[in-house]
């Protein structure tokens, strides 16, 4: 039962995000959202850009240990 409620809420939230973005696209002059606008509206953690989310920096840890 909890899973069904969770999925329903998730669907409502995603539908609202789609409606908001569609409404903003209608009001924009060129009918296109630039990537800069998307980054401002939906900020992502910096690890997304460096592609290191959830990964340890193996090279730096090997260097710190003296290569042992």
Curated annotation (Swiss-Prot):
Ranges in a coiled coil: none
Sites bearing Cysteine amide, chain numbering: 53
Keyword Iron-sulfur (UniProt): no
Signal peptide extent: 1-15
Distribution of this protein across tissues and organs: Expressed by the skin glands.
Cysteines paired by S-S bonds: 47-53
Keywords: Amidation, Amphibian defense peptide, Cleavage on pair of basic residues, Disulfide bond, Secreted, Signal
A cellular component annotation (GO) from this entry: extracellular region
Superkingdom field: Eukaryota
Compartmental location: Secreted
Annotated propeptide span(s): 16-41, 57-68
Any GO BP: defense response
Protein name listed in UniProt: Riparin-1.6
Origin species: Crinia riparia
């Amino acid at each position: 039962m909890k899973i069904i409620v969770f999925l329903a809420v998730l669907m409502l939230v995603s539908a609202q995000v789609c409606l908001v973005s569609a409404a903003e696209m209608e009001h924009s002059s060129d009918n296109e959202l630039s990537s800069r606008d998307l980054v401002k509206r939906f900020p992502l953690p910096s690890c997304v850009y460096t592609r290191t989310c959830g990964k340890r920096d193996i090279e730096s840890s090997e260097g710190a240990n003296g290569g042992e």
